[in-house]
Amino acid sequence: NVRADASYQAEGGARDMPYNQINSVPLEGNAENSDRLRSTLSATRLGLDFKAPIADQNLNAKIEVDFLGGANLDNLRIRHAYLNYGNWLIGQTWSNFATPDYIPETIDALAYVGASIKRTPQVRYTHKFTPNTNLVAAVEDPKDASMSQRMPAFTGRLNHKFNDALSISGRAMAHEKRIQNQEEWAYGVGVGAKFDITPVTSVKADYYHVKGDSSFVSFTNPGVVATGTSIEQSEFDSITVGLTQKFNDKLRGTLAYGYMTFDKNQDYLDAVADDTKINKNLWQAWGNLFYSPVQPVSLGVEYVYGEREAFAPAANGSKKGEDNRVNLVAIYNF
């Protein structure tokens, strides 16, 4: 597709991009960034799908790129690149743990608090118990830039579809974290659900509990910090829930809310240089409308408001930062 994004930021982050920065927005009265217009076409996607018959099955492959790579989110990058044969998948695609299936719809390409849009290199195997129940196991490279690693992350996901209206997913993750000669195991669990209340009204919800990792779920504090004698871990819970209403064939809208809260670990906070950058709570609420005047075109408008609360106050005593934006998008799908 070809995609153009724009954002008017009444209050928000310092980076020059029209996407979510809730975990790093300036605290009130401290170099706030307000009254900004930002735009980009970097979320434009190009992709190819391949299929080749082998024995009694097809070997499927996918390559997809966009331009949200690099420090400034303006370089070409790989989104998906994988082979799929039978029950096996090898390559890069959505993480088996941090799946986007249960995120309420949003215009923001980086999503909001409580969500994850993680893609990882992985080897994945899917086992079907019944037509409505399957177990997916994978080894993944989460590419955690904050530390060195010698082992992949181990992830598992159990999916079940009760009927055409209700589906759920339970997930688990474990990953060794190493800083120099110190090591700890990170872990996480997640559960998501989608329920179609009526043919035109649906609810999505997703929950995570994670300790010691910041590479899968978005907008977290650093998963681990080194004290010199040990590794201290961050621990958090997050939830996102949203209602989507289809008004007619051309118009739909979503109202949603995301929240993330971090446990207080004093040893962790003592090991961090600046506790104003370590968050105690994050939340965001958003509402959007998508209009499709003709089949390949979608136009969207969205309002989002959110806050972050830091563990430590800034020099002026403030612990709160705000994210207050209007997002616009135009998409041509081909």
Which stretches of residues belong to each language-model region?
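Outer membrane beta-barrel
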Residues: 1-18, 24-142, 148-155, 159-163, ...
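Outer-membrane beta-barrel translocator domains and adjoining extracellular loop/strand segments
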Residues: 10-15, 72-78, 100-107, 142-152, ...
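Residues that define the transmembrane beta-barrel architecture of outer-membrane proteins
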Residues: 35-44, 75-79, 117-121, 150-154, ...
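Transmembrane beta-barrel strand/turn architecture of Gram-negative outer membrane proteins
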Residues: 49-63, 169-175, 186-198, 288-290, ...
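Transmembrane beta-strand segments that form the barrel wall of outer-membrane beta-barrel proteins
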Residues: 58-69, 135-143, 167-178, 252-261, ...
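Membrane-embedded beta-strand positions of outer-membrane beta-barrel proteins
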Residues: 61-63, 88-92, 137, 158, ...
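Detector for outer-membrane/organellar transmembrane beta-barrel domains
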Residues: 156, 160-283
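Outer-membrane beta-barrel "beta-signal"
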Residues: 291-293, 320-334
